[in-house]
Amino acid sequence: MRKYENIYNLLIMKHFTALTIACFSLMNTHAFEPFANISIGAVSPDDLDASVSGFGAAAVPGTFELNGKESIKLEIGLKDDSGLSVGIQTAYNQMDIEDVSILGNPIGLALASLGAWNPAVPFDASGEVYTIPVLAFVGKEIPISDLLSIDLGFAAGYTTVEARPAGDLAGVFGQGNGNSWELQAKIGLDYQVSEKYSLGLDYSYSWLTGPEFGQAIAEDLGHHFIGASIGLNF
């Protein structure tokens, strides 16, 4: 199943690459300028479902309950006088592991059923998950007044996912790294402060294919981002 999922993701990336090249070719017919955007905000992730080994003879379903934390995003690219843009995006997203359940039960009870934990002792199932994407993006700026504009964008690329269990959870799951394909859709509202600077609000939703790290083979992960941005035109 994962083999066909990888083929599907590669097809998506192939079409997105073709779209990016087409947009860049179109830009060659217009005057364009380099720009950079920095967005600072927070992510709000979905819970991460995974197939977890180490709890019996076969892998069992588990859920990592995630809570979003800070996020910082950087975009560098080229924009033409029609508002079309292409470029590269990277980010640093941090999420906390709030709890872990195995077969619908708290992980402490799951371990107790195997004789590996005292059920009378609270289990500290904490930790952190980080994602660091490198994405190519295409965007379109749509003016709604002389100073305000709506910024639409779509990005795709490769993402590193790192899990760092802490507390008692670190004794069950080791630290692990995995990689995912990521697709992202974005909408923003920008205010042009001057010819060179703009301020804005950004919202995006990212979808990541399931990373594999340590004892967990994760399913797809989604997370929301909302933050404030500052833009610089060179």
Residue ranges and their predicted role:
Residues 43-47, 95-97, 158-170, 178, ...:
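Sequence/structural signature of outer-membrane beta-barrel proteins
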Residues 57-63, 120-126, 168-175, 211-218:
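Extracellular loop and loop/strand-boundary signature of outer-membrane beta-barrel proteins
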Residues 44-72, 178-179:
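Surface-exposed strand-loop-strand hairpins of Gram-negative outer-membrane beta-barrel proteins
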Residues 162-182, 186-192, 197-200:
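Conserved binding-pocket/active-site segment within a compact domain
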Residues 33, 40-42, 70-167, 191, ...:
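Gram-negative (and chloroplast) outer-membrane scaffold detector with strong preference
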Residues 1-35:
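Cleavable N-terminal export/targeting peptides
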Residues 49-52, 60-62, 95-98, 110-117, ...:
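Predominantly the C-terminal beta-signal and adjacent terminal strand-loop region
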Residues 136, 154-158, 179-187, 205:
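Hydrophobic alpha-helical segments of small multi-pass membrane proteins
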